[in-house]
C-alpha cells in the first residue's frame, strides 16, 4: 500500500470519516517546515568511533531535542538507546536506534550517521505472527508515527497490532524484501519524492 495521505491519517486519527481527516491534515500542514543541521565537514564513519558505549537513553539534551521534534520521550526511551563515543579526541553523545545486525543509526541535534554495520531495523511483536507490517524510511519517522498514534488514540493506540520495518535509508529497500515477503499487507510511509516512489515500486514487484 503506497503513500496515501488519507490512509495515513486514518491510521493516525483512528477514523474513517474523510471530512474530519482532511481537517486534521490541514491543521497539521502549516507547522511542517524543513530543518537542516551541519556539523562541519566531519564524517562519522565507523572506524572513527572510539570508546563507544551504548547506554539507556537519558541525556537531557537528547530528550529535549526529541521533544522539539514532537517525539514522545517515553516512547523514544523504549525504542532507542544512547551512544557515547569519542571522535577526534572529543566526546559526543547521540540517540542510537538499533538495527538487525548489531549496528545503530545515530542522531543528535547536529549530525546523523551510523555505527556499522548499516542495516534495516525489524520490530516484531511477540506472540502470534502479525499479518501486516508498516515500513518507514527512518527511525524519526517511526517515532513520529508512534507519537501521533498515541496522542490521537490514547486509550487504544494498538502499537502491537502490526510489525514494523525501518529502512534506515531507502538504499536498504532490497534488504527488506525478504522479511516483507511473509506479510499479507504492507503499508509504506515514505517521503513523496522520487526515492520514496522508487522504493515503493521495488516493494510492489
Where are these regions (language model features)?
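Phosphate-handling DNA/RNA-contact segment within nucleic-acid enzymes
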Residues: 85-179
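Terminal peptide-recognition signature
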Residues: 9, 66, 137, 145, ...
Amino acid at each position: 500500500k503506497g503513500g496515501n495521505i488519507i490512509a495515513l491519517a486514518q491510521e493516525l486519527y483512528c477514523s474513517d470519516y474523510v471530512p474530519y481527516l482532511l481537517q486534521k491534515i490541514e491543521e497539521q500542514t502549516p507547522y511542517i517546515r524543513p530543518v537542516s543541521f551541519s556539523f562541519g565537514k566531519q564524517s562519522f564513519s565507523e572506524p572513527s568511533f572510539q570508546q563507544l558505549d551504548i547506554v539507556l537513553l537519558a541525556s537531557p539534551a537528547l530528550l529535549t531535542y526529541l521533544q522539539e521534534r514532537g517525539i514522545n520521550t517515553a516512547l523514544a526511551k523504549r525504542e532507542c538507546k544512547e551512544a557515547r563515543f569519542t571522535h577526534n579526541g572529543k566526546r559526543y553523545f547521540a540517540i542510537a536506534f538499533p538495527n538487525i545486525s548489531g549496528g545503530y543509526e545515530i542522531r543528535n541535534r547536529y549530525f546523523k550517521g551510523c555505527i556499522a554495520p548499516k542495516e534495516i531495523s525489524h520490530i516484531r511483536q511477540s506472540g502470534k505472527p502479525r499479518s501486516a507490517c508498516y515500513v518507514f524510511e527512518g527511525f524519526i519517522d517511526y517515532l513520529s508515527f508512534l507519537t501521533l498514534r498515541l496522542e490521537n488514540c490514547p486509550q487504544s493506540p494498538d502499537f502491537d497490532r502490526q510489525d514494523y520495518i525501518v529502512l534506515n535509508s531507502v538504499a536498504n529497500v532490497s534488504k527488506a524484501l525478504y522479511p516483507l515477503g511473509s506479510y499479507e499487507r504492507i503499508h509504506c510511509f515514505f517521503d513523496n519524492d522520487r526515492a520514496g516512489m522508487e522504493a515503493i515500486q521495488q516493494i510492489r514487484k
